[in-house]
């Protein structure tokens, strides 16, 4: 059974069990409780099952027979009815995996000569700081977790994988999202990985609820991200920023144009242009940013500030245009990274 079928079947079964009439579950909180209870039973050595007899696995390889974290991400779209309106489009797993690998490889190449020793690479990966400015349900934060652990496992074969998972969760990955409901899913996925790796107590929260474009004293840049920025910034910025045009969103753009980010704004712009500029500002010297975005920015007059910043403040390592390939089923237009 394909992952999509597992997701659809679980939705149908869960709704039926919860409501008796196929209706929607009352809240994401209820589903989270069911999943966490299942995880805790498994940790205690008991067989835990989800409504409808489904298994719950933290391993994405089990997606053909179980509900996995990526299936939970797909469920998010069913719970958040305003996802399209907010510009949120959830990223397919194959793209997340590829982007995570490309970003880490590009960063390592810029930091270390080739050939490089395993000890040097392991040391760098142990200290890397990664940021997703629009976490959503945690596709990229989980993708980076898996990729960093896989690479470090090859370089440090004597280190138990659970130790590597806990180290990456505690030290390497940060994220921000303005949507509290979406962030709850991302935090839950981190919490599952933490517990499955033998983590004790609460995991330090590096996934922050807030507006990535809020530069005020009460915003995330002056609060949860301030220590990293004081130390020079992030090594990697990765993600899928919200695609929101000016049409029908005048208040949102007017507020942005009156903020400290006004220099990144222009007419006929898209919201993600400013996200990209802020992401570049968050990078440490020698850092790498990898975003998936609509490809029209290369010729759109409204993206002039972004193009100028790219040319003056940094360099382009790679552009990958997907052409007519529909990366996102629910989003119009062509995309690139």
Name each region found by the language model:
Residues 1, 5, 11, 139-142, ...:
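Signature of N6-adenine DNA methyltransferases within the class I
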Residues 1-174, 182, 211, 215-216, ...:
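Class I S-adenosyl-L-methionine
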């Amino acid at each position: 059974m394909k992952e999509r079928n597992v997701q659809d079947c679980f939705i149908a079964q869960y709704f039926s069990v919860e409501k008796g009439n196929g209706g929607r579950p009352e809240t994401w909180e209820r589903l989270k409780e069911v999943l966490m209870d299942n995880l805790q039973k498994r940790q205690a050595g008991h067989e835990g099952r989800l409504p409808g007899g489904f298994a719950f696995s933290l391993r994405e390889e089990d997606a053909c027979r179980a509900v996995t974290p990526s299936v939970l991400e797909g469920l998010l779209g069913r719970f958040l009815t305003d996802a399209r309106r907010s510009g949120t489009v959830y990223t397919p797993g194959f793209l997340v995996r590829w982007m995570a690998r490309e970003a880490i490889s590009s960063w390592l190449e810029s930091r270390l000569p080739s050939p490089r020793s395993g000890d040097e690479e392991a040391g760098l990966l142990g200290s890397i700081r990664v940021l997703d400015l629009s976490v959503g349900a945690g596709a990229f934060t989980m993708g980076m977790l898996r990729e960093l652990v896989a690479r470090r496992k090859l370089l440090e074969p004597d280190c138990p994988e659970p130790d590597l998972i806990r180290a990456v969760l505690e030290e390497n990955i940060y994220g921000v999202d303005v949507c509290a409901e979406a962030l709850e899913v991302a935090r839950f996925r981190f919490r599952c990985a933490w517990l499955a790796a033998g983590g004790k107590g609460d995991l330090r929260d590096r996934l922050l609820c807030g507006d990535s474009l809020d530069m005020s004293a009460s915003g995330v840049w002056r609060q949860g991200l301030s220590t990293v920025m004081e130390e020079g910034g992030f090594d990697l910025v990765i993600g899928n920023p919200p695609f929101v045009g000016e049409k029908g969103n005048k208040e949102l753009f007017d507020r942005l144009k009156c903020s400290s980010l006004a220099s990144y704004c222009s007419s006929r712009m898209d919201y993600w242009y400013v996200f990209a500029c802020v992401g570049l500002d968050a990078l440490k010297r020698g850092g790498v940013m990898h975003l998936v975005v609509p490809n029209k920015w290369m010729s759109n007059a409204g993206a002039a500030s972004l193009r100028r910043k790219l040319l003056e403040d940094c360099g382009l390592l790679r552009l990958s245009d997907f052409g007519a390939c529909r990366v996102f089923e629910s989003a119009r237009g062509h995309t690139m990274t």
